[in-house]
Curated annotation (Swiss-Prot):
This is Large ribosomal subunit protein bL12. GO terms for molecular function: mRNA binding; structural constituent of ribosome. The keyword DNA-binding does not apply. Keywords: Ribonucleoprotein, Ribosomal protein. GO terms for biological process: translation. The lineage of its organism: Bacteria, Pseudomonadati, Pseudomonadota, Alphaproteobacteria, Hyphomicrobiales.
Length: 125
């Protein structure tokens, strides 16, 4: 176990250039390449990238469908977006469409609740 700790200490004291040279020497000795290791680590890195995505700061509120109460949903869309009657009606009838983009989480949740109360199905992306 003391040998492993010595190896860890020695590796920790290497400069970046020395570590790169060590990597090349080990690649040659073991007959492997760092590119293969990166390809294998790629999916694991993708999983790690998904975690920060959960902490998004900007959301898009998407109207999935208007539901049964289309007129109520149109009224809410107008109130939320400031669109005219025709534009709001076109947006609601063309669902799924984004209602508001680039909003923070609190505002997105508030908009979602408003639209769902009116009878719409809403997604946050």
């Amino acid at each position: 176990m003391a040998d492993l700790q010595k190896i860890v200490d020695d590796l920790s004291s290497l400069t970046v250039l020395e570590a790169a040279e060590l990597a090349k020497l080990l690649e040659e000795k073991w007959g492997v390449s760092a590119a293969a290791a990166v390809a294998v680590a790629g999916p694991a890195g993708g999983g790690a990238a998904a975690a920060p995505a959960e902490e998004k700061t900007e959301f898009t509120v998407v109207l999935a469908s208007a539901g049964e109460k289309k007129i109520e949903v149109i009224k809410e869309v107008r109130a939320i977006t400031g669109l005219g009657l025709k534009e709001a009606k076109d947006l609601v009838e063309g669902a799924p469409k984004p209602v508001k983009e680039g909003v923070n989480k609190d505002e997105a949740e508030k908009i979602k609740v408003q639209l769902e109360k009116a009878g719409a199905k809403v997604e946050l992306k």
